[in-house]
Design a protein with these regions (language model features):
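Short internal beta-strands
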Residues: 67-69, 162, 375
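Short, well-ordered beta-strand micro-motif
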Residues: 42, 162, 177, 224-226, ...
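Active-site glycine-centered loops adjacent to acidic/histidine catalytic or metal-binding residues
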Residues: 24, 137, 269
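Proline-centered turn/helix-capping motifs that create local helix->coil transitions or kinks
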Residues: 83-92, 180-188, 193-197, 282-289, ...
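Conserved core of the sugar-phosphate nucleotidyltransferase
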Residues: 127, 141-224, 236-237
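Conserved N-terminal catalytic core of the sugar/cofactor nucleotidyltransferase
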Residues: 1-20, 28-150, 178, 393, ...
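Left-handed beta-helix
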Residues: 1-17, 205-213, 227-427
Length: 427
């Protein structure tokens, strides 16, 4: 890499290092993150969350990528090796970096900024012009070359991607304040009320191009830094990009806002994860961009077509290698190699199926089960006659065999649910 000085030309993808933030313990996605890093969580019947981000990168000719993780990185490492080794040319790489002790730091990653700080030395070896910081728990389709072009044409030190957002949806996000050139002049992380950021509204700003019902620009957690600017911004003890690094850098550097008008979803919670999967099943929201031809790269399994016998199937996605004899499947996603026995009814659920490499358990739903609004993780076994059907008002809780989140039952990986079990929210 040449380490070219910043100017007004578009940034060449070969002069960019990508750092993908894999998250910490993933407590908000527990128990799906009990045995794996967040980027390795299964999604959409046959993918992993990290596949979305890496597909965006590879389609954008970005092929030098580090994925940062802190916990349970084995399955992620295996997936990356199985899937992406063939996409990296000899002089490129897609590597997983786990938190490590060094002479400079003996601690775990303390936040998003600290994770990049501790890992930046790996990226600096190639002297890139820019570093692109992404998150592994977001679902969207983007050609990052548009972002690189914007960054160069605006002569920015930092470019932050943002999207138009309704006032009632900004509280969990970072709100961006821009001037008429879309230069960032303020940043407010997670405002409790729209009144606190009333002067951040951009619906009267022609350059922002936002609809009247989405008057705020909110950060997507996607940052493109000139490398020297990133190193300077992290030369401190700040732990988080949104809370400290971005607001401080906006005051001292030229930070530009890249408006993104596509669909985007954060899947940091079980409720959000469930919703995005159901949108994916319907082909709505973020799924639309991928169904228009932006295929997703994932592990190429050599599986036969699924066999479905005597089952009424309505509005479902069914992956390869399944054996299904159920009575009815409705509004559900059935993952690879799932087995579902006779007279079983499944509604509004996500069944993750089974990996060929699993040595603990084999995903199977027994006879005469009724399963509604559940997420059943890989390798789980559900005994005959099991009923899973809790009220929407069921409190969030963790039990020996399952967890409940926002009225959704989650059965952990390789769990064994005995025959006749009733998970119905009964007192």
């Amino acid at each position: 890499m040449s380490g070219k000085a910043s100017g007004t030309k578009a940034v060449d993808p070969s002069d960019v290092i990508v750092i993908v933030l894999g998250g910490g313990r993933g407590s908000r996605l527990y128990p799906l993150t009990r045995d794996r890093a967040k980027p390795a969580v299964a999604f959409g019947g046959k993918y992993r969350l990290v596949d979305i981000t890496l597909t965006n990168c590879l389609r954008s000719d970005l092929k030098n990528i580090f994925i940062l993780t802190q916990f349970n990185s084995f399955s992620l490492n295996r997936h990356i090796w199985q899937t992406y080794s063939r996409f990296a040319p000899r002089d490129s790489y897609i590597d997983v970096i786990a938190a490590e002790q060094t002479r400079e730091s003996g601690d775990w990653f303390q936040g998003t900024a600290d994770a990049v700080r501790q890992s930046l030395r790996h990226a600096l070896r190639d002297n890139p012009r820019c570093v692109l910081v992404l998150s592994a728990d977001q679902i969207y389709s983007m050609d990052y070359r548009d972002l690189l072009r914007w960054h160069g044409e605006h002569g920015a030190d930092v470019t932050i991607a943002a999207r138009a957002t309704p006032a009632n949806a900004i509280s969990p996000l970072g709100v961006v304040k821009v001037d008429e050139t879309l230069r960032v002049v303020g940043f407010y992380e997670k405002p409790r009320s729209p009144d606190l950021v009333a002067d951040y509204r951009v619906d009267q700003l022609p350059a922002a191009g936002v609809p009247a019902d989405k008057p705020f620009l909110c950060s997507m957690g996607l940052y493109l830094f000139n490398t020297d600017v990133l190193a300077d911004a992290l030369d401190n003890d700040e732990e988080d990009f949104g809370k400290s690094v971005i607001p401080q850098t906006a005051q001292r550097r030229h930070m530009s806002c890249f408006p993104f008008d596509g669909s985007w979803e954060d899947v940091g919670t079980i409720e959000a994860f469930y919703k995005v999967n159901m949108d994916w099943r319907r082909g709505s929201g973020v799924a639309e961009a991928f169904q228009r031809g932006a295929s997703i790269i994932t592990h190429a399994r050599q599986l036969p077509p699924s066999r479905i016998e005597g089952t009424l199937v309505e509005d479902c996605l069914i992956a390869d290698g399944c054996h299904i004899h159920a009575q009815r499947l409705t509004r559900s996603i059935i993952g690879v190699r799932a087995r579902i026995d006779d007279e079983t009814i499944i509604e509004d659920s996500i069944l993750m199926g089974n990996d060929a490499e699993e040595t603990l358990g084999c995903f199977e739903i027994g006879r005469e089960c009724v399963i509604r609004k559940a997420i059943i993780d890989k390798g789980a076994s559900i005994g005959d006659g099991t009923v899973i059907d809790v009220p929407e008002s069921t409190p969030d809780a963790d039990h020996e065999l399952y967890s409940t989140r926002s009225g959704i039952v989650v059965i952990p990986r390789v769990a064994v649910v005995p025959p006749g079990t009733r998970i119905c929210g009964d007192p």
